[in-house]
A protein has these predicted regions:
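Conserved N-terminal subdomain of the carbohydrate kinase-like
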Residues: 52-136
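Glycine-rich phosphate/adenosyl-contacting loop at the front of the ribokinase-like
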Residues: 1-77, 119
Length: 139
């Protein structure tokens, strides 16, 4: 009998805001917003493969947080360790695209002077799991 998920994915769930080819995602339109963040992507991928997986992270009480909450539930990701933050927004990463399609991460958008929700992750006891994946932003 399993005591917890096989894998816990700890870290970021964010929006990748891709600007138009050759443009700046901070000012040029249209932009293409995609749900992203390596731990969130891995959690969804493992769940689709039938692996018991939990996501541990913190999102804002905003449209981005709501979209991830729905996605995790739809994909079968355990959200018991998902925290929501009423004061800080979810993170948006600005991604510049060259005309040839190459991507360059340019910075963040959405901070209102309080930082981002993922910076305020409250310590929690992780359930027993066989594997732990940690994203790069918490480091």
């Amino acid at each position: 009998m399993a005591l917890g998920p096989v894998v816990v994915c700890l870290g970021e769930a964010l929006i990748d805001r891709l600007g138009p080819p050759g443009g700046d995602p901070a000012v040029d339109r249209p932009v293409d917003d995609r749900l992203g963040g390596a731990p969130a992507n891995v959690a969804c991928g493992l769940a689709r493969l039938g692996t018991s997986v939990a996501f541990a992270g913190r999102l804002g009480q905003d449209a981005i947080g709501a979209a991830f909450s729905r996605l995790f539930v739809e994909r079968g990701v355990d959200t018991a360790l998902l925290q929501r933050d009423a004061e800080r927004p979810s993170r948006i990463v600005l991604v510049r695209r060259a005309r040839d399609g190459e991507r360059q991460f340019q910075g963040f958008d959405g901070d209102q002077g309080t930082g981002f929700a993922d910076q305020a992750l409250e310590p929690a006891a992780l359930p027993p799991a066989r594997w732990l994946l940690i994203g790069t932003l918490p480091l």
